[in-house]
Amino acid sequence: VMSYSKKNVIRGLHIQTKKSQGKFVSVLKGKVYDVAVDLRKNSKTFGKFFSYVLSEKNSHSIYIPPGFAHGFCGLEKENYIIYSCTQYRNAASERAIKYNDKKLNIKWPVKKPVVSKKDQNAITFFKFKEKYLL
């Protein structure tokens, strides 16, 4: 899967609640601030986020295991991100957690974020836990 984003665009935090996907993420062009949130309820790092800067210059890639929500923001004018996923897309089980959730407290390096309507309407981390993990 390939994704294109412009500077200041934030996508996420996305997860499939059924057949959760592991993702291998790389940047072909540009630079992104990539975030993964651990949603595995029995994990020692449950509710914690991990962030990485991925770019065409540093050539870093990351693997995000199943059970993590994923999001990123574009840091350059044009950003091309490629994913290799461990499961097929399951649109019926796609969910989103607010990128700016107060509990998660992710410090996005963007002053004026551009966010899709879908992601603006995402639920809080607390509501996600209540609805899908308890």
Where are these regions (language model features)?
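Non-catalytic, conserved peripheral segments adjacent to functional cores
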Residues: 1-60, 73, 77-78, 85, ...
